[in-house]
């Protein structure tokens, strides 16, 4: 809206807005662009640029760019996108073109991790181009699904034209939402958790998850079959790839199925566009995933790999049955 109002004031067209982001964004951004007729401009990730880090940004940003999305905890791998580095790339673009492009930080996961265990990392309003931040209460905020938060740098950064005022509830009330009636239970629970645990309590919870993720990634890194994509140093999420081995008769999808038989849901999937030839497997560590559980998982992982290594022929790849039928 800020972009549109500025363009209208300058008597310039407003019919082709675009949003720049990594090709590894969560599907919510694809939905946003689709629903609101915004052109998505995806900056491809690669093995050299595993996240949006400012590389090639000048090829995607122009006068119709309404913003750049930086992700604190990429869905595919859990890695942080370096917000400060992205901001510096936008500074260089502004010096050359005069375009003042702002950053929205998608902190769905990292927004509830970085403040507690990485306090010195500049990703928030300490970065001058960051004007809004969103996060989820139900990922690492320790609240059940359905709660999300968004904050702006200043009140003026939320355009007044987006706020509606209603008077039929017994007094004038501002509302900013796509829907109207929403349950308040999640908000109350988040408030309770903040009061109950406090900053130090959240720090201890998130640090424990982080320590477990680092233990798991360290154990997996020592196995000959795998190479880590990342090690869970950002949010407690990490992914790994299968090493090349000419006579191997299985892949990560086979390992996923074997782990599922033991009760572990560890998804395997291709990386996004331009990197789909790379398949990874990912672990998400959250509150409640104890060190004892991590040790049990590593034991089962090694058992599954040993079973698959003992196959005389490749696993069948057609019409694989799922363990879920409900």
Segments (PLM) and residue ranges:
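Conserved PLP-enzyme active-site core in the AAT-like
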Residues: 1-164, 169, 185
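Non-catalytic terminal extensions of PLP-dependent enzymes
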Residues: 199-326
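Predominant activation on well-ordered alpha-helical scaffold segments within soluble catalytic domains
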Residues: 1, 30, 84-87, 187-194, ...
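Generic structural hydrophobic/aromatic packing signal, biased to beta-strands
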Residues: 19, 40, 103, 135, ...
